[in-house]
Amino acid sequence: MKLGELFEQAVEELSKAKVETPRLDAEILFMDTLSLAKSDFVLQKSRDLSDDEAAKLKELVDLRAKRMPVSRIIGKRGFWKYTFALNENTLDPRADSETLIEAVVKDYDKAAKVRILDLGTGSGCLLLSLLGDLVNAKGVGIDTSVGAVDMAKENAEANGLSDRATFVPVDWRDGEILGNLGKFDVVVANPPYIPLADIEGLKPEVKDYDPMLALAGGDDGLLSYRQIAMVLPLVLDAGGAFYAEIGKDKEERVKEIFTKSGYAFKKEYKDLGGIIRVLKFLSP
């Protein structure tokens, strides 16, 4: 079978499965599986596929038709300037989260020797992206999942950042252990912020494949922010900055949580869709 013929069949199958971007998803699966750049993929659509190649591609397209995300199928996701490997313990990085990276790197000189803490690090995408731009910064990422910590360590090594990044399995609610990490100039977090009642209505790509620990934010979606506000004094240095990713229309309630805890609200940042996605607070 010709590559182009199987590709068009794949696009049709994904369209019928109500995949939002069938052509793009099929392109990524085909190019990754065949190790082709975009230009080569276009030029080789007339070539014959081997039986093994065709079988493998059909298998992967079937998985996508069952709403497994492309990133889960190929085991990686591009985020900021890097590629991050994923496993079942890590949230699939979203483009919206790059808003947090943009906010931090605009606030600090590239050569600034800042110390960064990432609460709930997952794949390590936030911390590692920041360390990539802030070339003299060092950081620690914590996660309650040992599997996520192991994945973050692998990503640090793969992206040449392991000399400045440390990942440890810690629950941010454990103040005693958290306090032993020392104080940081910058703390970042993309905590779970989806209300429990909203989980069932999420897309299959999210509710069936992202870890529930990384999604569910309690009854009102604010539980993690309350927990973080309680332990933040243990890790954020005086005058330090806390950057929090938030869900849609949550800004006023999250501001209230942290300002009542003594933190000064500084700025809000919108994502590409115009939604307020990140809040910045300063430690007294």
Language-model features: where?
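Non-catalytic accessory regions of SAM-dependent methyltransferases
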Residues: M1-V42, S46-L49
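Conserved Class I SAM-dependent methyltransferase catalytic core
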Residues: D219-F281
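Conserved SAM/SAH cofactor-binding pocket of Class I
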Residues: A95-G201
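A general structural signal for well-ordered alpha-helical segments in protein cores
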Residues: F7, A26-E27, L57, R67-V70, ...
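Helix-to-beta-strand junctions that scaffold the AdoMet/dcAdoMet cofactor pocket
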Residues: L161, D210, L236-D237
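Residue-level signal for inorganic ion chemistry
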Residues: L29, R67, S97, L126, ...
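Mobile active-site "lid"/loop adjacent to the S-adenosyl-L-methionine
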Residues: Y193-S224
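Conserved AdoMet
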Residues: D32-K106
